Amino acid sequence: MHILMIGLNYKTAPVEIREKFSFQDSELPQALHQLRQMKSILECTIVSTCNRTELYVVADQLHTGRHFTKTFLADWFKLPKDEFTPFLTIRENDHAIEHLFRVVTGLDSMILGETQILGQVRNSFFIAQEEQVTGSIFNHLFKQAITLAKRAHSETDIGQNAVSVSYAAVELGKKIFDDFKGKQVLILGAGKMGELTAKHLHSNGAEQVTVINRTREKAAELAKRFLGVDRPYNELTEAIVEADILISSTGATGYVVTSDMVSHALKKRKGRPLFMVDIAVPRDLDPALASHDDVYLYDIDDLQNIVQTNLEERRTEAEKIELLIEEELVEFKQWLNTLGVVPIITALRTKALTVQGETMESIERKLPNLTEREKKVLRKHTKSIVNQLLRDPITRIKELANAPEREEALDLFTKIFALEEELAEQEKQEKVKQAEQEWLAKKRPITCMEKQSHVMVKS
């Protein structure tokens, strides 16, 4: 058994490539079953976000697993392999497991340590589970990965410091105001950065939002998102009088808010502090504003400096998570190795119980006058002898599962107990079971998610 990750992300592929390889949640059931039906694929999960599309599979062979996973991508997206192969990242076994752990903890994200990816991976896994395309390996692996991510964010401070310009403005504001509740936010311009900053302020308690923009319709549209109000551009000075926080991100080429304008407003504010954030380039707010008492002015460079400092702090926290990942990787490998000896343990039990059964049949033939109670007692005690004899070998083989000489030791164990025939029969039954599952997958009923998707397409 081998674990593979094949995919592309923001590091390896530009957005014009990534957008061609994106799965909608409604497409995942069909995609998962199509991938699972590919030769060599035993289990699978697909993680698809705006920054990555990654296919995780359990394959019986590495080379066929790689080949048929790429074939699935080519078939699904109807693109030749040579068009996307240069952008692919491939991770195998330990490296695939470690990669998943880094992804789910946010260490591989564009914004280091972000938590949104945890929900996205969890959702992808739940869909795969619901579609019954995961098995014992991925059920264990993804549950462990999700638990690791929760542990990483509870045991470290990686998510505590702002690493976006918009959220850095909120951090600065908290140094001036103990609480944003009841504070008036004035957004000057309807730009994306201003909107993001307002969103963070609003989620931190700033409920009263006013938007001013040269195009009134855009101002009204943005104000509506925050249950705020829009005002005409010629009321800017009056709006500054009422504001506690001003966020400016217009596309103007000169200063939109001048020192003289604020001087008039300050006379009516009676010493209330005014927090001003200039996200625009070129700047909207006259740098001379910083000379006024009760005015706290910050521009894009100030915010970038905060972001850079916080990034360094996050990198320090990320090192702690790397240690957690190492621990979890060792733990999963030990579990996986133990899982690998299950067929040998099963074969040993099968052989021992077969001998016990044959012995009981021989006893019953030679002692035909045994009562049912006597037979029951004999079965119980002979089975007890078998279990006692097997206890030490089974304990030892579980220990050998994680020993350096694992392969040689397991091979010797198999030969000593002559388990080749039992293992061959297990393998045969497993192939029959796999063939039945593949046949059932092709005959499977349409899922609720697919029905909803079909209805949406028709409508």
Swiss-Prot record:
A Pfam family it matches: GlutR_dimer
Keyword Oxidoreductase appears in the UniProt entry: yes
Marked site positions, Important for activity: H99
One example of a Gene Ontology biological process annotation: protoporphyrinogen IX biosynthetic process from glutamate
InterPro entries: 4pyrrol_synth_GluRdtase, 4pyrrol_synth_GluRdtase_dimer, 4pyrrol_synth_GluRdtase_N, GluRdtase_CS, GluRdtase_dimer_dom_sf, GluRdtase_N_sf, NAD(P)-bd_dom_sf, Shikm_DH/Glu-tRNA_Rdtase
Pathway annotation from the record: Porphyrin-containing compound metabolism; protoporphyrin-IX biosynthesis; 5-aminolevulinate from L-glutamyl-tRNA(Glu): step 1/2
Binding site for substrate: T49, C50, N51, R52, S109, E114, T115, Q116, Q120
Swiss-Prot/TrEMBL keywords: NADP, Oxidoreductase, Porphyrin biosynthesis
EC number: 1.2.1.70
Location of the active site: C50 (nucleophile)
UniProt-recorded Gene Ontology molecular function terms: glutamyl-tRNA reductase activity; NADP binding
Thylakoid among keywords: no
Binding site for NADP(+): G189, A190, G191, K192, M193, G194
Catalytic activity: (S)-4-amino-5-oxopentanoate + tRNA(Glu) + NADP(+) = L-glutamyl-tRNA(Glu) + NADPH + H(+)
Enzyme class: oxidoreductase
Database matches in PANTHER family: GLUTAMYL-TRNA REDUCTASE
Domain-related comment: Possesses an unusual extended V-shaped dimeric structure with each monomer consisting of three distinct domains arranged along a curved 'spinal' alpha-helix. The N-terminal catalytic domain specifically recognizes the glutamate moiety of the substrate. The second domain is the NADPH-binding domain, and the third C-terminal domain is responsible for dimerization.
Reported function: Catalyzes the NADPH-dependent reduction of glutamyl-tRNA(Glu) to glutamate 1-semialdehyde (GSA).
Miscellaneous comment text of the record: During catalysis, the active site Cys acts as a nucleophile attacking the alpha-carbonyl group of tRNA-bound glutamate with the formation of a thioester intermediate between enzyme and glutamate, and the concomitant release of tRNA(Glu). The thioester intermediate is finally reduced by direct hydride transfer from NADPH, to form the product GSA.
Subunit structure: Homodimer.
UniProt-listed NCBIfam families: hemA (TIGR01035), PRK00045.1-3 (NF000744)
Family: Belongs to the glutamyl-tRNA reductase family.
Protein name as catalogued: Glutamyl-tRNA reductase
Species: Halalkalibacterium halodurans (strain ATCC BAA-125 / DSM 18197 / FERM 7344 / JCM 9153 / C-125)
